[in-house]
Amino acid sequence: MAGDLNLKKSWNPALVKNQQKVWEEEQQKLDELKRIKERNQEYKQEQEYLELLKLQHGDQFQIKDLNKQQKLKISKLNWMYDDVPFEGNEKVEENSSGFIESNVEFTDGKSKVENLLKGNHVVGKKRDGSGTSDRINKIIGVGMTKSSKVSYSDDPLLKIKQQQQQAQRVARKQHPSDKHSHRSRHSSKSSSDRVHKSHEHERSRKHNSSHTRHKDGSPHR
């Protein structure tokens, strides 16, 4: 008895490829619904914040009447002005544009130089082995996880290169006499070649002299 011929039809819903298409469309609709909910939540939060501003400044308030942080929050630009957390003993100043200013970069190392000039060998700030200050390391490390900081050491190509260099160093340490033996063999070969050439030259000189005496009629001994 022949099987179900409907399984050979491309429109059959029992086929795996058709079920996969249905599942993918359902996932797309779920993602779209999730994005719509997120936008509605953001809009709701904005409306609540505007209601709070109306209670604080009145119904007819204008943007110019708000302070700096409120303007940035309404325009959704406050995340651009979030600076690195400063050290406890560092003085924080803000300019008219809302940027945080610090004079630590200009005065960094001043106390150390003054102490050296006075004869007091006291290190002013703690530094690491590379010579960079803690503040610079803090700024560089913002937004980086522990795994991302050590990602450079996990580079497979770098590891392969290091292994090759290590193998070359070990080979040079294990066979230090190969180079000298090669030089000695080369020097012995060159000296033997010079001796052989000198013998050939001596034989040719004797042969030429005997041939000259034979032409002159002198008796050949």
From Swiss-Prot:
Q: Where is the composition biased (Basic residues)?
A: 170-188, 204-214
Residue runs in coiled coils: 14-56
Task: Write down the InterPro entries for this protein, in alphabetical order.
Answer: CIR_N_dom (IPR019339), CWC25 (IPR022209)
Protease: is it a keyword of this entry? no
User: Which keywords describe this protein according to UniProt?
Assistant: Coiled coil, mRNA processing, mRNA splicing, Nucleus, Spliceosome
Q: Name one GO cellular component term.
A: spliceosomal complex
Q: Which Pfam families match?
A: Cir_N, CWC25
What this protein is reported to do is described as: Involved in pre-mRNA splicing.
* Family designation: Belongs to the CWC25 family.
Q: What is this protein called?
A: Pre-mRNA-splicing factor CWC25
In the UniProt record, the gene name given for this protein reads: CWC25
